[in-house]
Amino acid sequence: MGDIRQSLLPRDVLSAAKELLYHLDIYISNLVQSGRQPPQVDTKTLELVEEFILHAPKDRNALTRRMSALQELQLLEIMCSCFQEQSRDNVRQLMFSALFSLQGNQADDSRMALLGKLVSMAVAVSRVPILECAANWLQRTHCVYCVRLAQVLVDDYCSMMPGSVPTLQNIHSASPRFCCQFITAVTTLYDLTSEELTPPLELLQMIVSWIQEDPRLVLVTFLNTPLSGSPPSTSLDVTPLGGLVRWCVKAPLVYKRDKKQMLPHSSSGSEQEVAALFSALHLSVLQVFMLLPNILNEKGIFGRLALLQVESLASLTSDLSRLLDQADKHTHTPAADVHVHPQLALDRLAQALQVAMANGALLCSREDLRAICSRLPHNNFWDIFLRRLLQEGSDGT
């Protein structure tokens, strides 16, 4: 495709981008039809994408071509139509990869900006092919960039235009694969370490309703992922279970750190409403764990593949220990709440560990479990639970 550059240069920015998309579709269709395995887009084509769609200058002395806001909107509409009209999924996926796979160069910022706008538009107009392509992108891209994409959607649909939350909620039925990856990304983004990293109430309500309606939703990526090898450590987790457990365990303490910051992202809602949402979420997560034995046995991997990682739990217990120390120092906490919220956090962690281990989601030796739990302060209930769990696991380790 390198020979079409000269024909694109005289065109205006929108016309050039549209023409390149047309040729890119033909080029990739022919590439797939040739049967070459794996089909790979050549470097010159990627450079054309960067120059005429992402508008990264080919060299330092070249003038940077820019689109107006209207032209950019028109380009997004053209891209939506292009993916919608292409009937072959493998062509769509390869085309999406040519446009948005990160290359480790200066064009990546433009790539991410355009991707965020395209996916946000796809959510708004329910362009399922783009959401499916974005689900694959989220599965193979470094989690730092996945979180950036999730942040765009939360900002667009939960912050800047709260009334449009129902539009985002529809991704559950439009593309369960994308919805599952989105949940994993937002639980990675909002780790409850600060006010800014506490999920907005609207987002929390949406995720709870999704999982209550369909607990298997959080397993969609796992169920559709080949078991040929482990994903890179820099990728998102294969399920959002670790992030959801983190939310449920830390929530009683995080939302009590400062009553003035009870609902940092929302103008409505109450302490009781938030508590009820996290309680419902915790129950749903336990129900997901209880679905796993049949699923893992069907795949022949029960006891061989952990969906809840020991490293993630170690990080959680470290955070929880810090939060418990902070809770002890809060002088304005009502006396009745001094032990209630720490106890609730510990109870949820104990329940999650127990149910996860019993149902094959967590593969953990007694030594690992003891090391994880040693970070936590002494607590009668926790000590009893730990002794029982270690005793139950003694025959299998």
Question: Across the structure, where does each feature detected by a protein language model lie?
Answer:
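Hydrophobic alpha-helical segments
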Residues: 53, 291, 330, 352-359, ...
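Eukaryotic acidic, Ser/Thr-rich intrinsically disordered low-complexity regions
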Residues: 357-397
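Polar low-complexity intrinsically disordered regions enriched in Ser/Thr and small residues
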Residues: 38, 62, 278, 303-306, ...
